[in-house]
Amino acid sequence: MARAFLFVLDSFGIGNAPDAGAFGDLGADTLGHIAEFCAAGAADRAGLREGPLNLPNMSALGLMHAARLATGRLPAGMALPERVYGVYGAASEVSRGKDTPSGHWEIAGTPVTFDWGYFPADGDAFPPELVEAICREGDVPGILGNCHASGTDIIARLGEEHMRTGKPICYTSSDSVFQIAAHEQTFGLERLQDLCAVVRRLVDEYNIGRVIARPFVGSDPGSFTRTGNRRDYSVLPPAPTVLDRLKEAGRTVHAIGKIADIFAHQGVTRLTKANGNMALFDASLAAIDEAEDGALIFTNFVDFDMLYGHRRDVAGYAAALEAFDARLPDLDRRLKPGDMVILTADHGCDPTWRGTDHTRERVPVLMFGPTLRSRSVGIVGSFAHIGETVASHLGIDPGPHGRSLI
Protein backbone atom coordinates (compact mmCIF):
# COMPACT_ATOMS: atom_id res chain seq x y z
CA MET A 1 0.00 0.00 0.00
CA ALA A 2 1.08 3.59 -0.64
CA ARG A 3 2.02 6.47 1.65
CA ALA A 4 1.65 10.22 0.98
CA PHE A 5 3.66 13.14 2.33
CA LEU A 6 2.13 16.58 1.75
CA PHE A 7 4.42 19.55 2.48
CA VAL A 8 3.02 23.10 2.35
CA LEU A 9 5.68 25.78 1.95
CA ASP A 10 3.52 28.46 3.54
CA SER A 11 3.18 31.48 1.18
CA PHE A 12 5.49 30.20 -1.61
CA GLY A 13 3.63 31.66 -4.57
CA ILE A 14 5.03 31.50 -8.09
CA GLY A 15 3.20 34.32 -9.87
CA ASN A 16 -0.02 36.28 -9.67
CA ALA A 17 -3.24 34.29 -10.01
CA PRO A 18 -5.67 35.09 -12.86
CA ASP A 19 -7.92 36.97 -10.41
CA ALA A 20 -5.08 38.76 -8.59
CA GLY A 21 -6.33 42.15 -9.73
CA ALA A 22 -9.47 41.75 -7.64
CA PHE A 23 -7.23 41.42 -4.57
CA GLY A 24 -4.90 44.30 -5.44
CA ASP A 25 -2.13 41.83 -6.23
CA LEU A 26 -1.68 42.09 -9.99
CA GLY A 27 2.04 41.58 -10.60
CA ALA A 28 2.81 39.85 -7.30
CA ASP A 29 5.28 36.98 -7.67
CA THR A 30 6.89 35.61 -4.52
CA LEU A 31 9.42 33.33 -6.25
CA GLY A 32 10.02 35.62 -9.20
CA HIS A 33 10.70 38.74 -7.17
CA ILE A 34 12.92 36.92 -4.68
CA ALA A 35 14.93 35.55 -7.61
CA GLU A 36 15.08 39.02 -9.18
CA PHE A 37 16.45 40.57 -5.99
CA CYS A 38 18.96 37.74 -5.56
CA ALA A 39 20.18 38.03 -9.16
CA ALA A 40 20.71 41.77 -8.68
CA GLY A 41 22.67 41.28 -5.45
CA ALA A 42 19.89 42.98 -3.48
CA ALA A 43 19.34 39.91 -1.29
CA ASP A 44 22.95 39.45 -0.21
CA ARG A 45 23.35 39.48 3.56
CA ALA A 46 26.66 38.90 5.30
CA GLY A 47 26.75 35.58 7.10
CA LEU A 48 23.40 34.49 5.63
CA ARG A 49 23.48 34.17 1.84
CA GLU A 50 24.65 35.78 -1.38
CA GLY A 51 24.29 35.50 -5.14
CA PRO A 52 21.51 34.18 -7.37
CA LEU A 53 18.77 32.10 -5.79
CA ASN A 54 20.01 28.50 -5.64
CA LEU A 55 17.32 25.81 -5.52
CA PRO A 56 18.83 22.85 -7.41
CA ASN A 57 16.67 20.14 -5.88
CA MET A 58 13.30 21.83 -6.35
CA SER A 59 14.43 22.86 -9.84
CA ALA A 60 15.09 19.20 -10.63
CA LEU A 61 11.55 18.43 -9.43
CA GLY A 62 10.11 20.92 -11.93
CA LEU A 63 9.96 24.22 -10.02
CA MET A 64 11.39 26.27 -12.89
CA HIS A 65 8.96 24.65 -15.31
CA ALA A 66 6.07 25.33 -12.92
CA ALA A 67 7.12 28.97 -12.58
CA ARG A 68 7.23 29.32 -16.35
CA LEU A 69 3.74 27.81 -16.57
CA ALA A 70 2.50 30.37 -14.04
CA THR A 71 4.15 33.48 -15.49
CA GLY A 72 5.41 32.67 -18.98
CA ARG A 73 9.03 33.25 -17.99
CA LEU A 74 11.83 31.82 -15.89
CA PRO A 75 12.78 33.50 -12.60
CA ALA A 76 15.75 35.85 -12.96
CA GLY A 77 19.17 34.25 -12.56
CA MET A 78 17.74 30.72 -12.69
CA ALA A 79 17.83 28.16 -15.48
CA LEU A 80 16.01 25.00 -16.47
CA PRO A 81 17.68 21.85 -15.12
CA GLU A 82 19.15 19.29 -17.50
CA ARG A 83 16.51 16.80 -16.40
CA VAL A 84 13.28 16.89 -14.40
CA TYR A 85 12.56 14.03 -12.01
CA GLY A 86 9.11 15.01 -10.79
CA VAL A 87 5.53 15.63 -11.88
CA TYR A 88 5.00 19.38 -11.93
CA GLY A 89 2.34 22.01 -12.44
CA ALA A 90 1.03 25.36 -11.24
CA ALA A 91 -2.28 25.59 -9.36
CA SER A 92 -4.80 28.42 -9.10
CA GLU A 93 -7.10 28.85 -6.11
CA VAL A 94 -10.89 28.97 -6.47
CA SER A 95 -11.62 29.81 -2.83
CA ARG A 96 -12.68 33.40 -2.29
CA GLY A 97 -9.90 34.35 0.13
CA LYS A 98 -6.11 34.36 0.10
CA ASP A 99 -5.85 33.20 3.70
CA THR A 100 -4.35 30.15 5.37
CA PRO A 101 -7.56 28.19 6.10
CA SER A 102 -8.95 28.74 2.59
CA GLY A 103 -5.72 27.58 0.98
CA HIS A 104 -5.24 24.52 3.19
CA TRP A 105 -8.87 23.42 3.11
CA GLU A 106 -8.87 23.67 -0.68
CA ILE A 107 -5.61 21.70 -0.82
CA ALA A 108 -7.45 19.06 1.22
CA GLY A 109 -10.27 18.95 -1.33
CA THR A 110 -12.73 21.45 0.17
CA PRO A 111 -12.77 24.91 -1.45
CA VAL A 112 -14.24 27.85 0.46
CA THR A 113 -17.15 29.12 -1.59
CA PHE A 114 -18.43 31.71 0.90
CA ASP A 115 -17.05 35.11 1.87
CA TRP A 116 -15.25 35.45 5.19
CA GLY A 117 -15.94 38.35 7.48
CA TYR A 118 -13.27 41.04 7.71
CA PHE A 119 -12.57 43.95 10.02
CA PRO A 120 -12.31 47.48 8.55
CA ALA A 121 -8.93 49.09 7.95
CA ASP A 122 -10.07 52.63 8.80
CA GLY A 123 -10.69 53.71 12.39
CA ASP A 124 -11.21 51.14 15.11
CA ALA A 125 -11.04 47.66 13.63
CA PHE A 126 -13.37 45.99 16.13
CA PRO A 127 -17.00 46.90 16.90
CA PRO A 128 -17.48 48.44 20.39
CA GLU A 129 -19.91 45.70 21.39
CA LEU A 130 -17.30 43.03 20.53
CA VAL A 131 -14.62 44.84 22.56
CA GLU A 132 -17.02 45.13 25.51
CA ALA A 133 -17.82 41.42 25.34
CA ILE A 134 -14.13 40.50 25.17
CA CYS A 135 -13.32 42.61 28.22
CA ARG A 136 -16.29 41.26 30.17
CA GLU A 137 -16.07 37.57 29.28
CA GLY A 138 -12.29 37.49 28.95
CA ASP A 139 -11.77 39.34 32.24
CA VAL A 140 -9.35 41.94 30.88
CA PRO A 141 -9.32 45.68 31.74
CA GLY A 142 -9.38 46.75 28.09
CA ILE A 143 -7.53 46.11 24.85
CA LEU A 144 -4.68 47.83 23.03
CA GLY A 145 -4.27 48.19 19.30
CA ASN A 146 -7.74 47.70 17.80
CA CYS A 147 -6.33 48.19 14.31
CA HIS A 148 -4.72 46.62 11.26
CA ALA A 149 -1.05 46.07 12.01
CA SER A 150 2.10 44.05 11.49
CA GLY A 151 2.53 41.76 14.48
CA THR A 152 6.16 42.57 15.17
CA ASP A 153 5.57 46.31 14.75
CA ILE A 154 2.60 46.47 17.10
CA ILE A 155 4.40 44.43 19.78
CA ALA A 156 7.34 46.84 19.62
CA ARG A 157 4.98 49.81 19.83
CA LEU A 158 2.59 48.60 22.54
CA GLY A 159 4.46 45.83 24.34
CA GLU A 160 5.57 47.94 27.31
CA GLU A 161 2.10 49.44 27.80
CA HIS A 162 0.65 45.94 27.65
CA MET A 163 3.04 44.74 30.37
CA ARG A 164 2.20 47.76 32.51
CA THR A 165 -1.60 47.66 32.14
CA GLY A 166 -2.40 44.01 31.54
CA LYS A 167 -4.39 44.92 28.43
CA PRO A 168 -3.87 42.42 25.58
CA ILE A 169 -2.76 43.71 22.18
CA CYS A 170 -5.53 42.98 19.67
CA TYR A 171 -5.09 43.54 15.95
CA THR A 172 -6.07 42.23 12.52
CA SER A 173 -5.02 42.33 8.87
CA SER A 174 -6.57 41.99 5.43
CA ASP A 175 -7.18 38.33 6.30
CA SER A 176 -10.22 37.14 8.23
CA VAL A 177 -8.37 37.06 11.53
CA PHE A 178 -8.37 38.36 15.11
CA GLN A 179 -4.86 38.27 16.59
CA ILE A 180 -4.01 38.65 20.27
CA ALA A 181 -0.45 39.31 21.43
CA ALA A 182 0.44 38.99 25.11
CA HIS A 183 3.58 38.55 27.18
CA GLU A 184 4.18 34.97 28.29
CA GLN A 185 5.38 35.96 31.76
CA THR A 186 3.44 39.07 32.75
CA PHE A 187 0.13 38.05 31.15
CA GLY A 188 0.66 34.29 31.04
CA LEU A 189 0.51 31.79 28.19
CA GLU A 190 -2.41 29.81 29.60
CA ARG A 191 -4.37 33.01 30.21
CA LEU A 192 -3.72 34.10 26.62
CA GLN A 193 -4.96 30.77 25.31
CA ASP A 194 -8.07 30.95 27.49
CA LEU A 195 -8.75 34.47 26.20
CA CYS A 196 -8.37 33.30 22.60
CA ALA A 197 -10.91 30.53 23.23
CA VAL A 198 -13.37 33.16 24.49
CA VAL A 199 -12.73 35.42 21.50
CA ARG A 200 -13.08 32.47 19.10
CA ARG A 201 -16.65 32.01 20.33
CA LEU A 202 -17.42 35.73 20.25
CA VAL A 203 -16.25 36.31 16.66
CA ASP A 204 -18.25 33.41 15.22
CA GLU A 205 -21.14 35.77 14.50
CA TYR A 206 -18.76 37.94 12.46
CA ASN A 207 -17.69 34.91 10.35
CA ILE A 208 -14.02 35.36 11.23
CA GLY A 209 -11.81 32.49 10.09
CA ARG A 210 -9.14 32.46 12.79
CA VAL A 211 -8.20 33.76 16.21
CA ILE A 212 -4.44 33.57 16.71
CA ALA A 213 -2.54 33.61 20.00
CA ARG A 214 0.73 35.52 19.55
CA PRO A 215 2.77 35.16 22.76
CA PHE A 216 6.03 37.05 23.15
CA VAL A 217 8.84 37.55 25.65
CA GLY A 218 11.35 40.30 26.40
CA SER A 219 11.54 43.43 28.51
CA ASP A 220 11.59 46.31 26.01
CA PRO A 221 11.01 47.01 22.31
CA GLY A 222 14.58 46.03 21.50
CA SER A 223 14.21 42.58 23.05
CA PHE A 224 10.57 41.67 22.40
CA THR A 225 10.45 38.36 20.51
CA ARG A 226 7.50 36.20 19.55
CA THR A 227 7.82 32.66 20.87
CA GLY A 228 7.06 29.32 19.25
CA ASN A 229 3.87 28.93 21.31
CA ARG A 230 1.60 30.44 18.67
CA ARG A 231 -1.76 28.74 18.42
CA ASP A 232 -4.49 29.13 15.80
CA TYR A 233 -8.16 28.80 16.71
CA SER A 234 -9.93 28.03 13.43
CA VAL A 235 -13.53 27.31 12.58
CA LEU A 236 -14.29 23.85 11.24
CA PRO A 237 -13.95 23.30 7.49
CA PRO A 238 -17.33 23.74 5.76
CA ALA A 239 -17.43 20.12 4.55
CA PRO A 240 -15.42 16.92 5.06
CA THR A 241 -11.87 17.05 3.72
CA VAL A 242 -9.54 14.30 2.54
CA LEU A 243 -8.31 14.18 6.15
CA ASP A 244 -11.80 13.16 7.30
CA ARG A 245 -12.10 10.54 4.58
CA LEU A 246 -8.74 9.04 5.47
CA LYS A 247 -9.57 8.97 9.17
CA GLU A 248 -12.91 7.30 8.46
CA ALA A 249 -11.05 4.69 6.40
CA GLY A 250 -8.90 3.89 9.41
CA ARG A 251 -5.77 5.57 8.10
CA THR A 252 -3.22 7.61 10.02
CA VAL A 253 -3.35 11.36 9.40
CA HIS A 254 -0.25 12.83 11.05
CA ALA A 255 -0.45 16.64 11.25
CA ILE A 256 2.87 18.41 11.80
CA GLY A 257 3.25 22.08 12.73
CA LYS A 258 0.09 24.17 12.61
CA ILE A 259 -1.87 21.78 10.36
CA ALA A 260 -4.02 20.45 13.21
CA ASP A 261 -4.96 24.00 14.26
CA ILE A 262 -5.85 24.98 10.69
CA PHE A 263 -8.32 22.09 10.48
CA ALA A 264 -9.60 22.66 14.04
CA HIS A 265 -8.13 19.19 14.76
CA GLN A 266 -10.81 17.58 12.58
CA GLY A 267 -9.64 14.55 10.61
CA VAL A 268 -6.33 14.38 12.48
CA THR A 269 -5.28 11.17 14.23
CA ARG A 270 -1.84 12.27 15.41
CA LEU A 271 -0.11 15.62 15.76
CA THR A 272 3.41 16.88 16.31
CA LYS A 273 4.38 20.47 17.11
CA ALA A 274 7.77 21.90 16.21
CA ASN A 275 9.23 25.40 16.06
CA GLY A 276 11.06 26.47 12.91
CA ASN A 277 11.38 25.05 9.42
CA MET A 278 14.33 22.78 10.17
CA ALA A 279 12.66 21.35 13.28
CA LEU A 280 9.52 20.80 11.21
CA PHE A 281 11.58 19.02 8.56
CA ASP A 282 13.20 16.83 11.22
CA ALA A 283 9.78 16.00 12.67
CA SER A 284 8.52 15.11 9.20
CA LEU A 285 11.45 12.79 8.55
CA ALA A 286 10.89 11.08 11.90
CA ALA A 287 7.22 10.64 11.03
CA ILE A 288 8.11 9.19 7.64
CA ASP A 289 10.42 6.67 9.28
CA GLU A 290 7.49 5.45 11.41
CA ALA A 291 4.60 5.85 8.97
CA GLU A 292 2.65 2.73 8.12
CA ASP A 293 1.11 1.91 4.76
CA GLY A 294 -1.83 4.14 3.87
CA ALA A 295 -0.68 7.06 6.04
CA LEU A 296 -0.73 10.76 5.22
CA ILE A 297 1.89 13.04 6.76
CA PHE A 298 0.83 16.68 6.34
CA THR A 299 3.30 19.44 7.30
CA ASN A 300 3.11 23.22 7.16
CA PHE A 301 6.43 25.07 6.95
CA VAL A 302 5.34 28.36 8.48
CA ASP A 303 8.62 30.32 8.59
CA PHE A 304 8.44 31.33 4.93
CA ASP A 305 5.24 33.24 5.65
CA MET A 306 5.53 34.26 9.30
CA LEU A 307 9.19 35.27 9.49
CA TYR A 308 9.95 36.45 5.97
CA GLY A 309 6.88 37.04 3.80
CA HIS A 310 4.88 39.22 6.19
CA ARG A 311 8.04 40.95 7.37
CA ARG A 312 9.03 41.65 3.76
CA ASP A 313 12.46 40.12 4.32
CA VAL A 314 13.68 39.08 0.88
CA ALA A 315 17.10 37.83 1.97
CA GLY A 316 15.60 35.84 4.83
CA TYR A 317 13.00 34.25 2.55
CA ALA A 318 15.67 33.36 -0.02
CA ALA A 319 17.90 31.79 2.63
CA ALA A 320 14.97 29.81 4.03
CA LEU A 321 14.14 28.46 0.57
CA GLU A 322 17.75 27.45 0.02
CA ALA A 323 17.91 25.74 3.43
CA PHE A 324 14.69 23.83 2.71
CA ASP A 325 15.93 22.83 -0.73
CA ALA A 326 19.16 21.48 0.77
CA ARG A 327 17.17 19.10 3.00
CA LEU A 328 15.27 17.41 0.16
CA PRO A 329 17.92 14.71 -0.43
CA ASP A 330 17.40 13.65 3.22
CA LEU A 331 13.74 13.12 2.38
CA ASP A 332 14.40 11.37 -0.92
CA ARG A 333 16.65 8.79 0.75
CA ARG A 334 13.80 7.72 3.04
CA LEU A 335 11.24 7.05 0.33
CA LYS A 336 10.00 3.53 -0.35
CA PRO A 337 8.26 2.13 -3.43
CA GLY A 338 4.71 3.46 -3.41
CA ASP A 339 5.58 6.69 -1.57
CA MET A 340 4.54 10.05 -3.00
CA VAL A 341 5.68 13.52 -1.89
CA ILE A 342 3.80 16.68 -2.86
CA LEU A 343 5.37 20.12 -2.37
CA THR A 344 2.95 23.02 -2.71
CA ALA A 345 1.79 26.27 -1.05
CA ASP A 346 -1.42 27.80 0.27
CA HIS A 347 -1.10 31.36 -1.14
CA GLY A 348 1.63 33.90 -1.82
CA CYS A 349 3.30 36.48 0.41
CA ASP A 350 5.60 38.40 -1.89
CA PRO A 351 8.29 39.98 0.33
CA THR A 352 8.78 42.78 -2.20
CA TRP A 353 5.09 43.72 -2.32
CA ARG A 354 3.50 46.75 -0.71
CA GLY A 355 2.05 46.28 2.76
CA THR A 356 2.52 43.18 4.89
CA ASP A 357 -0.32 40.91 3.74
CA HIS A 358 -0.65 37.75 1.66
CA THR A 359 -0.69 37.96 -2.14
CA ARG A 360 -3.10 36.15 -4.48
CA GLU A 361 -0.85 33.83 -6.49
CA ARG A 362 -0.60 30.53 -8.24
CA VAL A 363 1.35 27.92 -6.31
CA PRO A 364 3.72 25.13 -7.36
CA VAL A 365 2.62 21.52 -7.42
CA LEU A 366 5.73 19.33 -7.34
CA MET A 367 5.17 15.58 -6.95
CA PHE A 368 7.80 12.89 -6.76
CA GLY A 369 8.41 9.36 -5.57
CA PRO A 370 10.12 6.12 -6.63
CA THR A 371 7.31 5.12 -9.00
CA LEU A 372 6.31 8.54 -10.40
CA ARG A 373 7.48 9.38 -13.92
CA SER A 374 8.31 12.95 -14.86
CA ARG A 375 5.65 14.94 -16.71
CA SER A 376 3.77 18.22 -16.66
CA VAL A 377 0.18 18.49 -15.41
CA GLY A 378 0.01 22.06 -16.69
CA ILE A 379 -2.09 24.78 -15.09
CA VAL A 380 -4.26 23.17 -12.43
CA GLY A 381 -7.62 24.89 -11.98
CA SER A 382 -8.04 24.31 -8.24
CA PHE A 383 -5.93 23.40 -5.24
CA ALA A 384 -8.56 20.69 -4.63
CA HIS A 385 -6.87 18.52 -7.27
CA ILE A 386 -4.01 18.11 -4.79
CA GLY A 387 -6.25 16.55 -2.17
CA GLU A 388 -7.86 14.29 -4.75
CA THR A 389 -4.40 13.19 -5.87
CA VAL A 390 -3.68 12.15 -2.28
CA ALA A 391 -7.02 10.33 -2.09
CA SER A 392 -6.38 8.45 -5.33
CA HIS A 393 -2.83 7.56 -4.37
CA LEU A 394 -3.95 6.19 -1.00
CA GLY A 395 -6.85 4.28 -2.50
CA ILE A 396 -9.87 5.96 -0.89
CA ASP A 397 -13.06 7.23 -2.51
CA PRO A 398 -12.87 10.56 -4.35
CA GLY A 399 -14.48 13.74 -3.09
CA PRO A 400 -16.83 16.09 -4.95
CA HIS A 401 -14.19 18.67 -5.93
CA GLY A 402 -11.18 18.16 -8.14
CA ARG A 403 -9.58 15.16 -9.78
CA SER A 404 -6.41 13.17 -9.34
CA LEU A 405 -3.34 14.46 -11.15
CA ILE A 406 -1.71 11.04 -11.36
From Swiss-Prot:
InterPro entries the record matches: Alkaline_phosphatase_core_sf, DeoB, Metalloenzyme, Phosphopentomutase_DeoB_cap_sf
Primary subcellular site in the record, as a coarse category: cytoplasm
Subcellular location per the Swiss-Prot or TrEMBL entry: Cytoplasm
Cofactor binding notes: Binds 2 manganese ions.
Entry keyword Metal-binding: yes
Record carries keyword Ribonucleoprotein: no
Pathway: Carbohydrate degradation; 2-deoxy-D-ribose 1-phosphate degradation; D-glyceraldehyde 3-phosphate and acetaldehyde from 2-deoxy-alpha-D-ribose 1-phosphate: step 1/2
Protein keywords: Cytoplasm, Isomerase, Manganese, Metal-binding
Binding-site residues, Mn(2+) 1: D10, D346, H347
GO cellular component: cytosol
Enzyme nomenclature, EC number: 5.4.2.7
Biological processes per GO annotation: 2-deoxyribose 1-phosphate catabolic process; 5-phosphoribose 1-diphosphate biosynthetic process; metabolic compound salvage; nucleotide metabolic process
Source organism, top-level taxon: Bacteria
Positions bound to Mn(2+) 2: D305, H310, H358
Reaction it catalyzes: 2-deoxy-alpha-D-ribose 1-phosphate = 2-deoxy-D-ribose 5-phosphate; alpha-D-ribose 1-phosphate = D-ribose 5-phosphate
Similarity comment: family membership: Belongs to the phosphopentomutase family.
Described purpose of this protein according to its UniProt entry: Isomerase that catalyzes the conversion of deoxy-ribose 1-phosphate (dRib-1-P) and ribose 1-phosphate (Rib-1-P) to deoxy-ribose 5-phosphate (dRib-5-P) and ribose 5-phosphate (Rib-5-P), respectively.
Protein name: Phosphopentomutase
Source organism per UniProt: Sinorhizobium medicae (strain WSM419) (Ensifer medicae)
Taxonomy of the source species: Bacteria, Pseudomonadati, Pseudomonadota, Alphaproteobacteria, Hyphomicrobiales
